[in-house]
Amino acid sequence: MDEVEMVMDILNESRKVRAATHNILAYRVSRPDGTFYQDHDDDGETAAGGRLLRLLVLADARNVVVVVSRWYGGVHLGPARFHVINTAAKVALESLGEIHQST
């Protein structure tokens, strides 16, 4: 979607965002017929974008783009990284009132 590319262009104006090891993205936009435009991008963090999108679906979040930036600091987090990434997204969505179902 053009709007998602525009959001990423704006975010990439930040040196910090550009320097992130991964900018994991998911979006979910409602359509007039009740279906959704939705997709994700792992940005090299295998399976992370899909997990973010699953969070958006479970939360029934609508008309949102979520980007979680991750900087590799030398410590391998293993599977725990998915919990950290989704928790960051969930906190952001909750602060905006975008959690409409229990996740």
Residue map of PLM features:
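Solvent-exposed alpha-helical segments within well-ordered globular domains of core cellular machineries
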Residues: 6-9, 54, 87
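Active-site-proximal loop/helix of nucleotide/amide-processing enzymes and allied scaffolds
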Residues: 49, 68-103
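C-terminal regulatory domains involved in ligand/effector binding and gene-expression control
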Residues: 1-46, 94-101
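Generic secondary-structure microfeatures
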Residues: 28-33, 56, 70-71
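Short glycine-rich, acidic/polar surface loops and turns
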Residues: 49-58
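Phosphate-backbone binding interfaces of nucleic-acid-interacting proteins
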Residues: 63-64
